[in-house]
């Protein structure tokens, strides 16, 4: 489950081509977290971990501070988080997460991307069952850390997969248990390198190279939109590229 998702994420960042898009996405997340939980990271767990995300992506400190200040500004128009679900070409399910200050603009744009690229926008909640909503934590390795012991300890907190990479450990857990998992990690001295929410497809659909090209067009159009934060789908990745 996890490694395939990490590969998809790496491809998405490669498509974006520069860090400006990553910074825009992170900035919105930071602003939303500061608006909901306050601007002080010591009192706001979600903001705290997003600041670690920003550090990992080399986001300038002034960008982070600006995103936090935006949340407490009296002139700030609040972002509304909206999800859109639909089918792309060849029956590929596509789940779109947005953060916008103008929902009318956003839904019109998202619908046009589907319609102009052989897809159709569905009703809210219609495709949610096709994806598992997960939280993901990347933590620094500890000396003499037993992954088996850690996994057993975290089962009670909703963690269902633990993976080891060269420099870090990656935990996948239930979305609803995000706060509990973060609290456990912080209280037990684990360094959280980054954290995110993902939607992992329950089943992947095989496509031909020609079909893949059509599907990737709609995914790219969606990801290029400034209001779109994340795009998830159930198309199986090209095994030759993953290798």
UniProtKB/Swiss-Prot annotation:
* InterPro entries xrefs: Integrase-like_N, TACO1_YebC-like_2nd/3rd_dom, TACO1_YebC_N, Transcrip_reg_TACO1-like, Transcrip_reg_TACO1-like_dom3, YebC-like
**Listed GO molecular functions?**
DNA binding
| Superkingdom of the organism of origin | Bacteria
Q: Name one GO cellular component term.
A: cytosol
Record keywords: Cytoplasm included? yes
Query: Which Pfam families does this chain map to?
Result: TACO1_YebC_N, Transcrip_reg
- Which Gene3D superfamilies does the entry link to? 1.10.10.200, 3.30.70.980
- Which key words are in the record? Cytoplasm, DNA-binding, Transcription, Transcription regulation
Gene Ontology BP annotations:
regulation of DNA-templated transcription
Q: Which family does it belong to?
A: Belongs to the TACO1 family.
Q: What is this protein called?
A: Probable transcriptional regulatory protein BDI_1233
């Amino acid at each position: 489950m996890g490694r395939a998702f990490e590969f998809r994420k790496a491809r998405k960042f490669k498509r974006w081509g520069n860090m400006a898009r990553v910074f825009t996405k992170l900035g919105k997340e930071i602003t939303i977290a500061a608006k909901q939980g306050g601007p002080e990271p010591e009192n706001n767990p979600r903001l705290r971990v997003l600041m670690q995300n920003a550090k990992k992506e080399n986001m300038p400190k002034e960008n982070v501070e600006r995103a936090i200040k935006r949340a407490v500004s009296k002139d700030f128009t609040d972002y509304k988080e909206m999800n859109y679900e639909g089918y792309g070409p060849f029956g590929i399910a596509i789940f779109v997460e947005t953060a916008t200050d103008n929902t009318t603009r956003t839904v019109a744009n998202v619908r046009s991307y589907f319609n102009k690229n052989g897809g159709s926008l569905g009703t809210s909640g219609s495709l949610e069952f096709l994806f598992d909503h997960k939280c993901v934590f990347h933590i620094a390795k500890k000396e003499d850390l037993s992954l088996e012991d850690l996994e057993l300890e975290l089962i009670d907190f909703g963690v269902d997969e633990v993976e080891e990479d060269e420099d870090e450990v990656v935990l996948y857990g239930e979305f609803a248990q995000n706060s509990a998992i973060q609290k456990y990690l912080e209280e037990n001295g684990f360094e959280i390198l980054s954290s995110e929410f993902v939607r992992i497809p329950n089943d992947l659909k095989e496509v031909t190279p020609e079909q893949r090209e059509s599907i990737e067009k709609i995914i790219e159009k969606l990801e290029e939109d400034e209001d779109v934060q994340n795009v998830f789908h159930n198309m199986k990745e090209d095994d030759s590229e993953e290798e």
